[in-house]
A protein has these predicted regions:
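Ferredoxin-reductase
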Residues: 3-108, 127, 163-165, 190-194
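FNR/FR-type flavoprotein reductase catalytic core
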Residues: 3, 10, 15, 93-209
Length: 209
Protein backbone atom coordinates (compact mmCIF):
# COMPACT_ATOMS: atom_id res chain seq x y z
CA UNK A 1 0.00 0.00 0.00
CA UNK A 2 1.31 3.45 -0.86
CA UNK A 3 -0.02 7.00 -1.09
CA UNK A 4 2.13 7.87 -4.14
CA UNK A 5 0.83 8.48 -7.63
CA UNK A 6 0.35 5.38 -9.78
CA UNK A 7 2.32 4.54 -12.88
CA UNK A 8 0.43 4.42 -16.20
CA UNK A 9 -1.69 1.30 -16.63
CA UNK A 10 -3.31 -0.45 -19.56
CA UNK A 11 -5.81 1.53 -21.60
CA UNK A 12 -8.25 -1.37 -21.93
CA UNK A 13 -9.22 -4.07 -19.42
CA UNK A 14 -7.00 -7.15 -19.48
CA UNK A 15 -8.78 -10.44 -20.13
CA UNK A 16 -6.15 -12.60 -18.42
CA UNK A 17 -4.15 -12.29 -15.21
CA UNK A 18 -3.34 -8.69 -14.35
CA UNK A 19 -0.92 -7.09 -11.89
CA UNK A 20 -0.76 -3.51 -10.66
CA UNK A 21 -2.18 -1.07 -8.13
CA UNK A 22 -5.76 -0.19 -7.27
CA UNK A 23 -6.92 2.76 -5.19
CA UNK A 24 -9.04 2.24 -2.07
CA UNK A 25 -12.10 4.33 -2.88
CA UNK A 26 -14.36 3.31 0.03
CA UNK A 27 -14.10 1.26 3.21
CA UNK A 28 -17.31 -0.23 4.62
CA UNK A 29 -17.52 -1.55 8.20
CA UNK A 30 -19.79 -4.56 7.66
CA UNK A 31 -19.52 -6.03 11.19
CA UNK A 32 -17.23 -5.38 14.17
CA UNK A 33 -14.51 -7.52 12.57
CA UNK A 34 -15.35 -7.45 8.86
CA UNK A 35 -14.60 -4.66 6.38
CA UNK A 36 -15.26 -4.35 2.66
CA UNK A 37 -12.72 -2.48 0.56
CA UNK A 38 -13.92 -0.92 -2.69
CA UNK A 39 -11.03 -0.71 -5.15
CA UNK A 40 -10.95 1.40 -8.30
CA UNK A 41 -8.60 2.16 -11.16
CA UNK A 42 -6.26 4.90 -9.86
CA UNK A 43 -6.21 6.39 -13.37
CA UNK A 44 -9.98 6.65 -13.45
CA UNK A 45 -12.43 4.90 -15.73
CA UNK A 46 -13.09 1.18 -15.85
CA UNK A 47 -11.10 -1.48 -14.05
CA UNK A 48 -7.90 -2.60 -15.81
CA UNK A 49 -9.15 -6.20 -15.86
CA UNK A 50 -12.32 -8.27 -16.13
CA UNK A 51 -13.36 -11.15 -13.88
CA UNK A 52 -15.97 -13.85 -13.41
CA UNK A 53 -18.29 -14.17 -10.37
CA UNK A 54 -16.52 -16.31 -7.77
CA UNK A 55 -12.93 -15.39 -8.65
CA UNK A 56 -10.44 -13.79 -6.26
CA UNK A 57 -7.66 -11.20 -6.16
CA UNK A 58 -4.21 -11.53 -4.60
CA UNK A 59 -3.33 -8.60 -2.34
CA UNK A 60 0.28 -7.91 -1.34
CA UNK A 61 1.33 -5.74 1.61
CA UNK A 62 4.73 -4.95 3.07
CA UNK A 63 5.23 -5.94 6.70
CA UNK A 64 8.65 -5.60 8.30
CA UNK A 65 10.01 -4.87 4.86
CA UNK A 66 8.80 -8.17 3.42
CA UNK A 67 5.95 -8.69 0.93
CA UNK A 68 3.12 -10.87 2.24
CA UNK A 69 0.37 -12.13 -0.05
CA UNK A 70 -3.20 -13.15 0.72
CA UNK A 71 -6.08 -14.21 -1.51
CA UNK A 72 -9.46 -12.49 -1.12
CA UNK A 73 -12.57 -13.42 -3.05
CA UNK A 74 -14.30 -10.67 -4.99
CA UNK A 75 -17.70 -9.85 -3.49
CA UNK A 76 -18.96 -7.44 -6.15
CA UNK A 77 -20.58 -8.23 -9.47
CA UNK A 78 -18.57 -8.33 -12.72
CA UNK A 79 -21.22 -6.03 -14.18
CA UNK A 80 -19.77 -3.22 -12.04
CA UNK A 81 -16.97 -2.18 -14.37
CA UNK A 82 -15.81 0.83 -12.33
CA UNK A 83 -14.89 -0.93 -9.09
CA UNK A 84 -14.23 -4.25 -7.42
CA UNK A 85 -14.87 -5.10 -3.75
CA UNK A 86 -13.17 -7.55 -1.41
CA UNK A 87 -14.50 -8.36 2.05
CA UNK A 88 -11.93 -9.12 4.75
CA UNK A 89 -12.38 -10.51 8.26
CA UNK A 90 -9.87 -9.35 10.86
CA UNK A 91 -8.44 -12.66 12.01
CA UNK A 92 -6.68 -12.84 15.37
CA UNK A 93 -2.97 -12.64 14.61
CA UNK A 94 -3.67 -12.22 10.90
CA UNK A 95 -0.78 -10.34 9.31
CA UNK A 96 -2.51 -9.08 6.18
CA UNK A 97 -6.06 -8.85 7.54
CA UNK A 98 -4.75 -6.87 10.51
CA UNK A 99 -2.80 -4.59 8.20
CA UNK A 100 -5.84 -3.94 6.02
CA UNK A 101 -8.12 -3.28 8.99
CA UNK A 102 -5.73 -1.16 11.06
CA UNK A 103 -3.64 0.75 8.53
CA UNK A 104 -5.34 0.97 5.14
CA UNK A 105 -7.52 4.03 4.57
CA UNK A 106 -9.44 5.55 1.69
CA UNK A 107 -7.10 6.96 -0.94
CA UNK A 108 -4.33 4.41 -0.38
CA UNK A 109 -3.00 2.22 -3.17
CA UNK A 110 -2.92 -1.56 -2.88
CA UNK A 111 -0.74 -3.94 -4.86
CA UNK A 112 -3.08 -6.45 -6.48
CA UNK A 113 -2.94 -9.24 -9.03
CA UNK A 114 -5.48 -11.52 -10.62
CA UNK A 115 -8.21 -12.39 -11.12
CA UNK A 116 -7.77 -16.09 -10.43
CA UNK A 117 -9.96 -19.04 -9.53
CA UNK A 118 -12.19 -21.61 -11.17
CA UNK A 119 -15.02 -21.60 -8.57
CA UNK A 120 -17.28 -19.59 -10.84
CA UNK A 121 -20.91 -19.58 -11.92
CA UNK A 122 -22.24 -17.42 -14.74
CA UNK A 123 -25.71 -18.92 -15.22
CA UNK A 124 -24.77 -20.84 -18.34
CA UNK A 125 -23.75 -23.99 -16.47
CA UNK A 126 -27.26 -25.04 -15.36
CA UNK A 127 -30.78 -23.73 -14.76
CA UNK A 128 -30.67 -23.58 -10.95
CA UNK A 129 -28.01 -23.33 -8.27
CA UNK A 130 -27.65 -24.10 -4.55
CA UNK A 131 -25.10 -21.94 -2.71
CA UNK A 132 -23.88 -22.87 0.78
CA UNK A 133 -21.70 -20.53 2.82
CA UNK A 134 -20.85 -19.40 6.32
CA UNK A 135 -19.57 -16.15 7.81
CA UNK A 136 -17.27 -14.15 5.56
CA UNK A 137 -17.12 -17.21 3.30
CA UNK A 138 -20.28 -15.90 1.66
CA UNK A 139 -18.28 -13.44 -0.47
CA UNK A 140 -18.07 -15.55 -3.66
CA UNK A 141 -21.77 -16.36 -3.33
CA UNK A 142 -22.60 -12.65 -3.11
CA UNK A 143 -20.67 -12.01 -6.30
CA UNK A 144 -22.60 -14.78 -8.03
CA UNK A 145 -25.99 -13.61 -6.71
CA UNK A 146 -25.34 -9.97 -7.59
CA UNK A 147 -24.22 -10.95 -11.08
CA UNK A 148 -27.26 -13.14 -11.70
CA UNK A 149 -29.51 -10.36 -10.40
CA UNK A 150 -27.88 -7.76 -12.63
CA UNK A 151 -28.33 -10.07 -15.61
CA UNK A 152 -31.97 -10.82 -14.71
CA UNK A 153 -31.15 -14.54 -14.73
CA UNK A 154 -34.34 -16.61 -15.01
CA UNK A 155 -33.09 -19.60 -13.02
CA UNK A 156 -33.69 -20.52 -9.37
CA UNK A 157 -31.14 -19.55 -6.71
CA UNK A 158 -31.06 -21.22 -3.27
CA UNK A 159 -28.77 -19.87 -0.55
CA UNK A 160 -28.03 -21.61 2.75
CA UNK A 161 -26.06 -19.24 4.98
CA UNK A 162 -24.73 -19.86 8.48
CA UNK A 163 -23.37 -17.30 10.95
CA UNK A 164 -22.24 -17.42 14.56
CA UNK A 165 -24.60 -14.59 15.55
CA UNK A 166 -26.62 -11.85 13.77
CA UNK A 167 -23.94 -9.20 14.32
CA UNK A 168 -21.36 -11.36 12.51
CA UNK A 169 -23.36 -11.59 9.29
CA UNK A 170 -21.30 -10.23 6.39
CA UNK A 171 -24.15 -9.86 3.92
CA UNK A 172 -26.18 -7.09 5.52
CA UNK A 173 -25.04 -3.89 3.77
CA UNK A 174 -26.23 -4.71 0.27
CA UNK A 175 -27.69 -8.19 0.47
CA UNK A 176 -29.13 -8.05 -3.03
CA UNK A 177 -30.83 -11.26 -4.05
CA UNK A 178 -32.23 -12.62 -7.25
CA UNK A 179 -36.00 -12.30 -7.58
CA UNK A 180 -36.04 -16.10 -7.79
CA UNK A 181 -33.73 -16.59 -4.80
CA UNK A 182 -34.68 -18.54 -1.69
CA UNK A 183 -32.53 -17.92 1.38
CA UNK A 184 -32.25 -20.02 4.52
CA UNK A 185 -29.99 -18.78 7.33
CA UNK A 186 -29.04 -20.35 10.64
CA UNK A 187 -27.01 -19.13 13.61
CA UNK A 188 -24.72 -21.39 15.60
CA UNK A 189 -25.37 -19.44 18.83
CA UNK A 190 -28.73 -18.32 20.29
CA UNK A 191 -29.94 -14.77 19.68
CA UNK A 192 -32.88 -12.58 20.65
CA UNK A 193 -34.45 -12.59 17.20
CA UNK A 194 -37.87 -14.27 17.45
CA UNK A 195 -38.06 -17.63 15.70
CA UNK A 196 -34.50 -17.31 14.38
CA UNK A 197 -33.24 -20.84 13.62
CA UNK A 198 -30.24 -21.88 15.69
CA UNK A 199 -27.79 -24.73 15.24
CA UNK A 200 -25.09 -25.98 12.91
CA UNK A 201 -26.17 -27.25 9.52
CA UNK A 202 -26.03 -30.98 8.79
CA UNK A 203 -25.32 -32.62 5.48
CA UNK A 204 -29.00 -33.56 5.07
CA UNK A 205 -30.09 -29.92 5.49
CA UNK A 206 -31.27 -30.22 9.10
CA UNK A 207 -29.77 -28.31 12.03
CA UNK A 208 -27.92 -29.60 15.07
CA UNK A 209 -28.72 -27.46 18.11
Amino acid sequence: VAPSEPSPGPAVPATGRWSGRLRVARVFQETPDVKTFRLMNPLGGVLPFTFLPGQFLTLTVLTDGKPVKRLYTIASSPTQHDYVEVTVKHEAGGVVSGYLHDRVKEGDLLDCSGPTGSFVFTGRECKCILLIGGGVGITPMMSVIRYLTDRAWAGDVYLIYGVHAPRTSSSGRRSSTSPAATRTSARSSPCRTPRAPTGRARRDGSRRS
